[in-house]
Amino acid sequence: MSGAIASSPAATLFLAGSSSSSPRRRRSRVSGVWWHLYGGTGLRLHWERRGLVRDGAVVCSASAAGGEDGVAKAKTKSAGSSKAVAVQGSTAKADHVEDSVSSPKYVKPAVAKQNGEVVSRATKSDAPVSKPKVDPSVPASKAEADGNAQAVESKAALDKKEDVGVAEPLEAKADAGGDAGAVSSADDSENKESGPLAGPNVMNVIVVASECSPFCKTGGLGDVVGALPKALARRGHRVMVVIPRYGEYAEAKDLGVRKRYRVAGQDSEVSYFHAFIDGVDFVFLEAPPFRHRHNDIYGGERFDVLKRMILFCKAAVEVPWFAPCGGSIYGDGNLVFIANDWHTALLPVYLKAYYRDNGLMQYTRSVLVIHNIAHQGRGPVDDFATMDLPEHYIDHFRLYDPVGGEHSNVFAAGLKMADRAVTVSHGYLWEIKTMDGGWGLHEIINHNDWKLQGIVNGIDMAEWNPEVDEHLQSDGYANYTFETLDTGKKQCKEALQRQLGLQVRDDVPLIGFIGRLDHQKGVDIIGDAMPWIAGQDVQVVMLGTGRPDLEEMLRRFESEHNDKVRGWVGFSVQLAHRITAGADVLLMPSRFEPCGLNQLYAMAYGTVPVVHAVGGLRDTVAPFDPFADTGLGWTFDRAEANRMIDALGHCLNTYRNYKESWRGLQARGMAQDLSWDHAAELYEDVLVKAKYQW
């Protein structure tokens, strides 16, 4: 993409695909019921892959679409649609075929009741689908008339595939065959009758990130990118995740597509790999700078990291046209990109500078998710020359820092160019508007306040559910629900004590800590409080890796208090699950925490959190009120050892002397709907706002 866009083969296709002036949503009257078509051929094929097409028609209930009862069927008239179906194969119309690569069936978390009431964070989860949102600028008659025009556009786009390098090699067809003919999770059997949960707001969604669990992960960002797309797909959206291919991923098949991009005077060839898992397309971009970085995603010199992210974003913004998934590309109609943190904040910038400023991708929108604003892609102003952007765009990057002076800031430019932005909690949204919490970007954030929304993360209940957790199925551990909490959690606690060589005692409170060993996570606050903690009748298990001095601190604690403290330096997914299940209390003294996931995992497992009331911790852990018998844990208001000791002391007293109150804390924690389903509904609202933003 380093050259002039107007001369590239891609430009021809973009112009052909964006000639219609109306949004990619059509509606026509069929048998007295509204029948909705979205975004051209690609999204329709996605529904066929998920078993939602019968006799050539998209099955959509009237309740989901806001119309009459019943299900409408209509024959496909578009030649483009017919051609696309043919590409995908004769099995595309199968009503339902088991997905050979899907994860274990989603299991609803155990629901606990207290005083006859169920506590749930997601009060809207069972609310009826809202009425469809219609663009008032497009009359119904015009929308119907444009339907034929869109069919021509879709066909033209497919006919152009050879021109833009979207070949159909054997590898791609074999991969698409597995996707198109057999697809999706058990939940689709319900959606087949009722239509997509998103109703008329179904879109093409491309999530772009530098990491994604289980392929590559360094922290919470990887967990979010691994779970949110699946939740959006369950709502009926066609969803793709784009990440670098750091290693050899067995699931990924080579699409046979190659593109070259120039960064800092060097050409890099990017290869496209694809997998279809849990109803989501995963596209992996392979290039020399990404190879063999599986365990060192953000390693290397600052400028080398920047060049990798420039290459990644340049390639990712073109994925809708060059990555055929299930036999069809996503295209630029009815499309929203979701970029994550500074690593992909250049994507909204390239989308605007390369395409929308030139009349292309006019129906494509971008959303930027802020997971941690402390990392911003800062560098000297000279970095701008590496980004291959029009000269006037430098003003979007230039930022003055009272400490470091004038510099280039990637996150700042991304926030300005994105159509919408999301923070991972309401509390964090408030914090980043302040001088202390905004890390130099507070003025930009306040100026763009209208486009920001806070949405608390969910957790992947296929992985973090004590009822089905695979890490609790051996070595003396046990799966459990709220109904079997007394025996199951006790068994996990005893197994953890044995595994780590601690005295097996059910009466002693076991305190856990899981996290990076750095200043943000506040592990040094635990260090300051350790003399007091060691003087209590408790056991402590700490798991993490990070700063060498803090790693040494963990080893020293275990050496000095070998009868009650274990410090595991390193990281083990299995041990993290087992600590979450076996501990009675989870400590999170983070100095700042955009959302936090460990406290959510803990509550789902009946483990009571003690947290510093910042960011998402304040949003998700309501303080215990012994008089009203409400709350989920204990909070403290300053990142200081004495404040943490005070909160932890009250927690331990309740554990020992007020068993009924303790049981209530566990019940309320486990009763919450902490899944991604509610968060996905809120993200969908943001996507809709972006879609209709002009």
Swiss-Prot record:
Q: Does the keyword Nucleotide-binding apply?
A: no
Could you tell me which residues belong to the region Disordered?
Answer: 93-197
**Which biological pathway?**
Glycan biosynthesis; starch biosynthesis
Compositionally biased residues, Low complexity: 127-142, 177-186
Does Aminoacyl-tRNA synthetase count among this protein's keywords? no
Alphabetical GO biological process terms: starch biosynthetic process
Keywords attached to this Swiss-Prot or TrEMBL record, sorted alphabetically, are: Amyloplast, Chloroplast, Glycosyltransferase, Plastid, Starch biosynthesis, Transferase, Transit peptide
- Record's GO cellular component terms: amyloplast; chloroplast
Q: Which domain of life is it from?
A: Eukaryota
Q: Which residues cross the membrane?
A: none
Task: Say which family it is in.
Answer: Belongs to the glycosyltransferase 1 family. Bacterial/plant glycogen synthase subfamily.
- The name of this protein is Soluble starch synthase 2-2, chloroplastic/amyloplastic
The EC number on file is 2.4.1.21
Transit peptide as recorded in UniProt = 1-15
Residues reported in the UniProt entry to bind ADP-alpha-D-glucose: K217
Q: Which reaction does it catalyse?
A: [(1->4)-alpha-D-glucosyl](n) + ADP-alpha-D-glucose = [(1->4)-alpha-D-glucosyl](n+1) + ADP + H(+)
What does it do?
May contribute to the deposition of transient starch in chloroplasts of leaves.
What taxonomic lineage is listed for the species of origin? Eukaryota, Viridiplantae, Streptophyta, Embryophyta, Tracheophyta
A GO term, aspect molecular function: alpha-1,4-glucan glucosyltransferase (UDP-glucose donor) activity
Q: Name one Pfam family in it.
A: Glyco_trans_1_4
Q: Where in the cell is it found?
A: Plastid, Amyloplast; Plastid, Chloroplast
- Expressing tissues: Expressed in leaves and weakly in endosperm and roots.
The record, for SUPFAM superfamilies, names: UDP-Glycosyltransferase/glycogen phosphorylase (SSF53756)
Basic and acidic residues bias spans: 156-176
Chief subcellular location equals plastid
